[in-house]
């Protein structure tokens, strides 16, 4: 009984909580300009439009250099877990992004994002995503 609180801390979080945590880590990596943290969340077969994982990494470096000061917020995050496998999921959210070289943003946009995730070795990785502007 005395070990119960310690053992509880070692449990794997439920899939939905783990997915929300993975999305939050992605958000934090994007805002912080941490290419490594973002790349750690991308599956080996990741796709975004015509970009594969490697090309997405190069694009991130360019964006981070162009906008050294940036903010990223994921809002209205909804997780839809595959009820059969519990290893695949769709996560949708609104993304608000803005950035620039100084304190005031030079550019800002908002997107509706639909992303597919897969559990690999205990970690949730992003397989692909679709984003469209909220003004579209």
Regions picked out by a protein language model, each given a short descriptive name:
Residues 6-34, 40:
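Short, low-complexity N-terminal intrinsically disordered segments enriched in polar/charged residues
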Residues 39-78, 84, 93:
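Short solvent-exposed beta->alpha transition segments
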């Amino acid at each position: 009984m005395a070990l119960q609180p310690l053992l509880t801390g070692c449990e794997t979080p439920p899939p939905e909580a783990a997915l929300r945590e993975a999305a939050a880590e992605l958000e934090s990596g994007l805002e912080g300009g941490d290419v490594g943290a973002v790349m750690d969340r991308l599956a080996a077969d990741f796709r975004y439009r015509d970009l594969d994982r490697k090309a997405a990494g190069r694009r991130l470096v360019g964006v981070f250099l162009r906008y050294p000061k940036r903010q990223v917020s994921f809002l209205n995050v909804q997780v839809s877990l595959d009820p059969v496998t519990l290893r695949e999921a769709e996560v949708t959210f609104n993304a608000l992004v803005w950035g620039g070289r100084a304190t005031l943003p030079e550019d800002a946009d908002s997107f509706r994002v639909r992303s597919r995730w897969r559990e690999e070795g205990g970690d949730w990785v992003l397989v692909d995503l679709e984003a469209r502007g909220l003004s579209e």
